[in-house]
């Protein structure tokens, strides 16, 4: 894995400007690019190694340690399954789509059989959705905003599954936090790669957009002044 890898080590080999970004944060950056109206949300990416990200005020909010939204190692079941991080009961060990297939079955294969109505697959799916719902409830206890669900598993979720998931979240939510939107991510191909590139170009793009916005306001102000002069 890449545990312990530092930016300094990467920079020595690449010889170009570098930055490190969590894949979930990168995917969230792409969400902002795809939807300019997005302001506040908790993003939950159900990859084989799940993760999360926080969007606040229309921007990715990573915090001082660059790890806001890292829900994958939030304790979901105290003393539960062993996680690769060394702890037990982490969200990763219950919400990874790798927990869905039976022996020798692929993740797409699981969802294919699920669509056929196989009872045992339905039971496994229901249990998995319960765990995902509880993870979302836990995350929203800190940031009670809207929720975006993405990642490999989300690509296989139908609208009915998303609605079912929201119902499970509401059923577990404390009073006063059950009014929110829950939708599927855009699930674009290579979304995290797109987001990582956007993160690197963020200041440049903000400069262009900021200049354009200042120009628009200046033109509007000039037009208003001219109108006032004509009225006099």
Stretches found by the model and what they are:
Residues 1-86, 90-91, 208-223, 231-232:
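Phosphate-binding/catalytic loop of phosphoryl-transfer enzymes
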Residues 12-16, 35, 87, 91-232:
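ATP-binding/phosphotransfer module of carbohydrate and carboxylate kinases, centering on a glycine-rich
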């Amino acid at each position: 894995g890449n545990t312990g890898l530092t930016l300094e080590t990467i920079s020595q080999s690449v010889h170009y400007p570098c930055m490190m970004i969590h894949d979930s944060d990168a995917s969230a950056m792409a969400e902002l690019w795809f939807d300019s109206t997005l302001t506040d949300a908790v993003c939950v990416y159900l990859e084989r190694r799940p993760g999360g990200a926080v969007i606040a005020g229309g921007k990715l909010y990573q915090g001082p340690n660059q790890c806001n939204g890292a829900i994958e190692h939030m304790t979901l079941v105290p003393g539960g399954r062993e996680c690769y991080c060394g702890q037990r009961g982490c969200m990763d060990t219950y919400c990874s789509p790798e927990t869905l297939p039976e022996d020798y079955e692929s993740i797409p294969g699981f969802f294919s059989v699920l669509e056929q109505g196989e009872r045992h697959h339905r039971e496994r799916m229901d249990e998995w959705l319960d765990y995902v719902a509880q993870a979302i409830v836990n995350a929203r206890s800190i940031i009670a905003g809207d929720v975006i669900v993405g990642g490999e598993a989300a690509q296989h979720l139908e609208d009915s599954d998303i609605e079912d998931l929201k119902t499970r979240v509401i059923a577990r939510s404390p009073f006063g936090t059950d009014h929110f939107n829950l939708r599927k991510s855009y699930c674009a191909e290579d979304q995290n790669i797109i987001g990582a590139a956007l993160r690197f170009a963020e200041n440049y793009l903000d400069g262009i957009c900021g200049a354009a916005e200042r120009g628009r306001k200046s033109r509007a102000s000039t037009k208003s002044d001219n109108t006032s002069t004509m009225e006099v």
